[in-house]
Amino acid sequence: MAAVTAKLVKELRDKTGAGMMDCKKALAATDGDTDKAVEWLRQKGIASAEKKSGRTAAEGSIGSYIHTGARVGVLIEINCETDFVARGDMFQELLRDVSMQVAACPNVEYVTTDEIPPEISEREKAIEMGRDDLEGKPEKMKEKIVEGRIAKRLKELALMEQPFIKDSSITVAELVKQAAGKIGENVKVRRFTRYTLGEGIEVEDNDFAAEVASMQNAG
């Protein structure tokens, strides 16, 4: 298998406009053959998606998903460039898939890691720096370990970083990118809200026997 060098990655990136990680995957899948890698990216819809990512996506649709048992519900907004595409089967399928993804990810709070407020990162850093397993380690090593843990934690909070529930070999970001390439427009997940039945309600846990006794005493 041919080595995937930085030079090959840059060459492919310049040709297609695809992201660095996508270029690496394409070259690895095609044994370092740049022409085949371009075809691989086009088949995945990635090359064309990157070129469209700068265009304004002001149309789209708001989708909903209610999980079996009606205990979890999701509202999500995904944008595209035209109303025609928003009404199409491919876009609507993406809307359903990402809605289901949100329902399956109770810890996800943001669309991307870029949206996570700095204070969240600082809070996570304070928690990690105080962990017992870091005690006695050199400061530079400690910082590096903490940095890795924070990055992992922030990814857990971001929808686009999650493995796609129907195909864990790709992330939600890659799913959206592939859909954009196939649709031929810029596609962007803008926002979402996840509802869990009873969330935030404090349920009083009474002892049934004590409750009966108190009712008798009251009588």
Swiss-Prot record:
Molecular function as annotated in GO: translation elongation factor activity
GO cellular component: cytoplasm
Pfam families: EF_TS
Keyword Ribonucleoprotein found: no
Its biological purpose: Associates with the EF-Tu.GDP complex and induces the exchange of GDP to GTP. It remains bound to the aminoacyl-tRNA.EF-Tu.GTP complex up to the GTP hydrolysis stage on the ribosome.
HAMAP family in alphabetical order: EF_Ts (MF_00050)
PANTHER family: ELONGATION FACTOR TS, POLYPROTEIN OF EF-TS, CHLOROPLASTIC
Name of protein: Elongation factor Ts
Species, as recorded: Synechococcus sp. (strain CC9902)
Lineage, top ranks: Bacteria, Bacillati, Cyanobacteriota, Cyanophyceae, Synechococcales
Gene: tsf
